[in-house]
Structures are given as structure tokens and as C-alpha cells.
Amino acid sequence: MIKERPIPVLEVFGPTVQGEGMVIGRKTMFVRTAGCDYSCSWCDSAFTWDGSGKDDIRLLAASDVIAELETIGGAAFDHVTISGGNPALLPQLGGLIDGLHARGIQVALETQGSRWQPWFADIDDLTLSPKPPSSGMSTNWEVLDDIVRRLSEAGRRFCMKVVVFDDEDLAYAKLVHERYPGIPFYAQAGNDNLTETDPAIMLPYLVERYEWLIGRTMADETLRGIHVLPQLHTWVWGNKKGV
Amino acid sequence: MIKERPIPVLEVFGPTVQGEGMVIGRKTMFVRTAGCDYSCSWCDSAFTWDGSGKDDIRLLAASDVIAELETIGGAAFDHVTISGGNPALLPQLGGLIDGLHARGIQVALETQGSRWQPWFADIDDLTLSPKPPSSGMSTNWEVLDDIVRRLSEAGRRFCMKVVVFDDEDLAYAKLVHERYPGIPFYAQAGNDNLTETDPAIMLPYLVERYEWLIGRTMADETLRGIHVLPQLHTWVWGNKKGV
């Protein structure tokens, strides 16, 4: 019997609310995997790839991850979000997804869309979140096209999400929406203040960023079917980790 | 030819973001109808039923409503939310819904579930929002059961939403979720401060109310598949009307 490859896990926490995107508000548990092929300038989870979190990485079997989810979350959840880093680097996640489904638990996952995995077609709430110019990364459109094509063929519910910090990012968001017109599209106001800890400063600033994005998108005829959302968890918990 | 019955309209505005529930963040136009069979203690649109807005009511044909939506929203929208009051008091809304669909525009509607209309089955995003004890209203469960049964038979996407102000409301929310277990369920933190105009006071208060509701629901095993959301528009615009 071939030994299952373990999963590099950095955090397991919850239940909490999903703060972004297509299932915003959903009660969910989080599993955060280590490792990323990107290094976005404004990444809010840089410890997953910049080396600073390396001592916290645990190599766990899928069954261990599920056991830990059940220890922490008890019977209070039926939804798990796999986050990163880029979980799409890990072919071995298929076993975890199958194990969760076997327990009646739904699975959400977000990835930048730089790498395909066959288990994408099994994710209940899949978000492809290509990164805009402000990230410093560049999009491989051929790979992204291929992922969108495969998911569409599989008849799978998924959405596109672009984080927007400035007008250049917004132009990129429009490009993405025009390239994949049939796919539900989310624009998210970016948080470019990752160090502020005072909610009295943080909260009005984030609301102002969200209001800016609303102002830039509402009258735009190329963004008719758009959702515009904040990162709700940063409004509640600021830059705190593990909530 | 039978003359179409006009629609009592109080407000037409947008495009803006939907601030609540199953399509939170969605770019949408709003049509607010006059009249309600309820008079919730904390209603944020009491002008639709308490007489204070009666001089603003216009009796419009469906085609006039659509023309006004297009004048205000141009070609920048593909989604309209019909709100109230209780729009379910108006059998004549079917023509408006058909007219919007004919233009490729999706329609959302929220109602307390006190009255069935055949056009419920045509709504793209329908929210049934029975009112908890703090409203001072009482739920007719037979009517609500009947509406849920008809919508389920029609294979229509819809959800349940309960606004929660206190623990008694939360107990009611659980009752609703247990009664309709297969239906996507949203709990929404209530805004019991309808007069505050200072965002520096309003915003932290609303965040605190939302955090309270998260705290009361996350560990609860009877609320596994729940979404917990704020009224996002009140976080951005406070108690302002028409945004």
C-alpha cells in the first residue's frame, strides 16, 4: 500500500464566520496549509511562505486534520475552508476533501488559479482569485483559462474574485470579468494596512476603502453582475490571526 | 382589455450594493413598495406603513417602474431588489417581474412570509424573513409552512433569514432553522439604533452587535449550516435613506 503523503498544516481554527467572497458569513472551520508559489506584496498570510512560520508547520495525515477539526469544532460545524498559502500546490488534498465529504461536511477553497488539481472539481465553494498588479505578481492566463474550462466542463459552482487596492487593480478586475463573463464575479476591497492594531483607526479606514470601491464600480457598465465586498473579518477582528 | 393594477412605489434607487442576506454585496437597484401587514417595533422603513410617507407614494405601471430604473441606473445593472413594506401584499408585481426578466434582469425580493403570491416562484433570490419576538409580531406558521412547501415544490432557490436582537430572538431563529432544516439559513444582527447619525458611535456599536451574534452562534450545534451577517449598508451609510 502506498503511504499517503502528509499535508503541511500551519493553522486549524474555528468555528468562525467566513469573512470574504461567495460564502461570506458562512459558519466554517479553517485549515491553513503552508507554501505558496506567489509572494504578493500585501499578503496577509506571508508566514505561510516567507519562512517566518516554518517552525509551526506540522505534517499531518488527512485523518489527523479531520480529528483535529472535530476536537476543536465539535459537532457545531458542517463546512471547512481550506486556505493558504496556495493549497493548489498540494495534490494530496484529495484525501482530506473526500474524508470531509464522507462526514457530510462541505468544503470551500481559495486559490490564485496558477495550478490545476483534479480535486478542484470536488470543492463545493471554489474561488479563483487571480492577483492584480499591486500584488507584484503576474497572471498566467493560459493556466487560468484551462482551470476555468475544466471547472465549467465539470459543471461545478465556482467564482472569480479580485482584490482591488487602486485603479490599476480595478482595470485588471474588469479584464478578468470580461474574460470569464459567465462566472460570478466578486471584487474585494484590499486591506493595505496590515500593522494597525487600534480598531478606532482601522475600522473607519476599512469602511472608507470599501466605500471607495463601491463608488468606482456602481456606475460601471462593464461590471453589471458584480458583487462588491469587504473582508468582513478585518472589520470585526482587525489584523488578528486565528479568528 | 383589463387595465393593469398600478404598483404603490415609495422609492426607486441605485445602483448600490445589497447590504444583507443571500446576495450580500451584489450590485442591485432597489424598488421599495408601500404598505405592510406588519408593524415591527424596530422597522427601519416604518415610513412604508406608518403614514409618514403617504405623500411620497406614486402609483406606477410596471413599465413606468422599469423606465425609471433604466433612467436612474442606465445600463450599469442586471439585478433589481424589490423591498417594502411587504411586497407580497401586491398581486400585481408579477408583471414587473416578467418585464425585468424579459430584459435579462434578475429579481430579488424579501418578505416576512405572511402571504403567498404565485409570482414567488419566479423570484431569482427570494428571502423569507419571519419576524422574531422583539418585533412584537407573531408568526402564522401554517402560512409560512405552506409558502416553504410551494417554493420547494417549484424547485426554487430561496433562503430563510431571521434578524436577531437578543437571546429570545435567537431561540426563535433556532426554531425556524429546525422547522425548515434543508433551507439555507441566515441570522442577521439587528440594528436597534435607528436615530444615531455619528459614524464614530454607530460603527463600533454595530460591529459589537455582530460580534455578539457570532459569539452566540458559533459553538451552537443546532446552527451548523448557518450564515451570520451584519447589515453591511448600515456599517457604511448608517441610517441614511436611499443608498
State what each model feature region is.
Chain A
Residues 6-10, 14, 229-232:
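Generic secondary-structure boundary/loop-capping signal
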Residues 3, 10-11, 17, 27-28, ...:
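Conserved Radical SAM active-site core
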Residues 77, 88-243:
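Conserved AdoMet/S-adenosylmethionine-binding subsite of the radical SAM
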Residues 17-22, 39, 237-238:
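Short N-terminal binding/cap micro-motifs at the start of the first secondary-structure element
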Residues 21, 43, 52-55, 172, ...:
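Short linear functional motifs in flexible/disordered or boundary regions
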